[in-house]
Amino acid sequence: MKLLKREGLSLTEEKALWMYQKMLEIRGFEDKVHELFAQGVLPGFVHLYAGEEAVAVGVCAHLHDGDSITSTHRGHGHCIAKGCDLDGMMAEIFGKATGLCKGKGGSMHIADLDKGMLGANGIVGGGFTLACGSALTAKYKQTKNVSVCFFGDGANNQGTFHEGLNLAAVWNLPVVFVAENNGYGEATPFEYASACDSIADRAAAYNMPGVTVDGKDILAVYQAAEEAIERARNGGGPSLIECMTYRNYGHFEGDAQTYKTKDERVEHLEEKDAIQGFKNYLLKETDANKLSDIEQRVSESIEKAVSFSEDSPYPKDSELLTDVYVSYEKGGM
């Protein structure tokens, strides 16, 4: 088993290639959704995760199906990193009956309980208490499972942020809070809306570790997540990780992004692209043909997901009032 190393961090070649594949799946999926939305094919709103791939993948690389995550309105990347089916995800965004939520959730409410994906959430800050509830279940059942709460920088000013972190600390819950600080709460720069220079600084108020990492460097995210997740899994309690990142697209599709400068977009989209940076690292550590094979497979899987969705039926009218209430036969998390 070949180990790839960098500054004290080691991971297997197999894991590194899995991470590369997941990053490409997220980017390919989001770029395709961007294209389809512009064509007027997709119903509803979409908020794209492209550019932030290193965060979701670097964290979820340490999770298994028994672990759970909560997500945001920008949740496609978290779903893919957690192992959700690409066909089912694309069909859900198309509003088709073969979607993960039978076409009823759409982009902002994709969930897959079998994969521990408790749901994307249209409510800003809606995932904090859900993650705590899942973590409480894991602690009560002594499963050693952990819960991860992904949230954006805009959510760190919501009351549920403080309620969730406080409760997690008081009850010593196995939960990791992951802040995706992409610099803007919709169009408002982070520094205009926060009295703290860093979201991670707020961890001190709740007596938990807090760290800020480069969210464009997947190995930095991977290393920080490994420590926090193992701490939670072994009874050490909650942690807060702030990942400094950048979204390639607007807050939503149709956002003109007039609040961003041309120079910053060039810097992040061309000079600091997370996928290209990880690929440059892998080219020094593994066979380039392996990367090419992954790129080809991912491209084919995205096109397959689109074809599957286009060929799938819409939900029947008789389905309108079904699934109004939760009925999860496996007994929940």
UniProtKB/Swiss-Prot annotation:
UniProt-listed InterPro entries: DH_E1 (IPR001017), PDH_E1_Alpha_Subunit (IPR050642), THDP-binding (IPR029061)
GO function term, MF aspect, one: pyruvate dehydrogenase (acetyl-transferring) activity
SUPFAM superfamilies per record: Thiamin diphosphate-binding fold (THDP-binding)
Keyword set includes Oxidoreductase: yes
Pathway per the UniProt entry: Ketone degradation; acetoin degradation
EC identifiers of the protein: 1.1.1.-
Deleted gene: phenotype: Cells lacking this gene are unable to utilize acetoin as carbon source.
Inducing factors: Strongly induced by acetoin. Transcriptionally up-regulated by AcoR and sigma-L factor. Subject to catabolite repression by glucose, in a CcpA-independent manner.
A single BP term in Gene Ontology: pyruvate decarboxylation to acetyl-CoA
Keywords linked to the UniProt accession: Acetoin catabolism, Oxidoreductase, Thiamine pyrophosphate
Needed cofactors: thiamine diphosphate
Keyword Oxidoreductase listed: yes
Top EC group: oxidoreductase
Function of the protein: Catalyzes the 2,6-dichlorophenolindophenol-dependent cleavage of acetoin into acetate and acetaldehyde. The alpha subunit is probably the catalytic subunit of the enzyme.
Subunit field text: Tetramer of 2 alpha and 2 beta subunits.
The protein's name in its UniProt record: Acetoin:2,6-dichlorophenolindophenol oxidoreductase subunit alpha
Organism for this UniProt entry: Bacillus subtilis (strain 168)
Source organism phylogeny: Bacteria, Bacillati, Bacillota, Bacilli, Bacillales
